[in-house]
Amino acid sequence: MKKITIALLIGLFATVSVNAQMKEGKIVYERKINMWKMITDPEMRTRIPEFRTSEFELLFNEQASLFRSVPEDEAPDPFANSGGGGGPRFMFRMPETTTFTDLATQMQYESRPMFEKTFLIVDSLKPLKWKISEETKTIAKHVCKKATTTVTAQNVRIGGTGGFRLGRNNNDTAKGSTVITPKETEVIVWYTQDIVASVGPDNYTGLPGAILEVDLDNGANIITATEVSSKYAKKDLVQPTKGERMNKAQFQDTMKKLMEDMQKGGGMGGMRIRMGNN
């Protein structure tokens, strides 16, 4: 009789544990970009904060997810406590993007405002080859496992003038321009099985749970969950439809042409720059 009672209790606790797994909700992330890893000019570094932080949120259920940036109108001045020298200072504001992922069809719809227009980038998700580790750590009160993969990312190097060039090697930055080249990059993520949905920030999915942290290129770009909640605005979890529709390859070709035009005429497109003085 005791054995039966113990077995029933174990079964009950197992059921409770499974039911406790989140199937829908919201994850708030902080993205921290190391700007100095892109900037080679020492003088320009004194005018730009080492780290650029921004906030994002991921709305999700078992069918879809929506990753979007949080408005930065009230963002604090990163130079407020830096103690930097005088002269003009640069603050970079990235365009506010929205990425919707249909988990059933593995299709992604990204609305991206750039160059005074909106692009709707529609394409299938590229499966990532994850290597899962048993190493764990806690993020936002959730135990996470480690996984790694490699991706081809855009390697950006900014020289002294800030002009744009599509170069082939980092030596081009000595000419005082910005060089964008493809680069094989390691990605380390931490995911939790406390959340059933296979979701994550940006294009990072495909693990048995939700990704709560992404480390791209050894700290160059880190996205970390700061809050996880079962409550979210369900009405906002919808596929974007507005914008000039194209796939990722077409978008990359369009960006290449626009960057070349920027090199000739100047401008930063959808990226905003604020300048000020100490």
Label the model's feature ranges.
Residues 1-27, 278:
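Bacterial Sec-dependent N-terminal signal peptides
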Residues 22-278:
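Extended soluble regions of mature proteins
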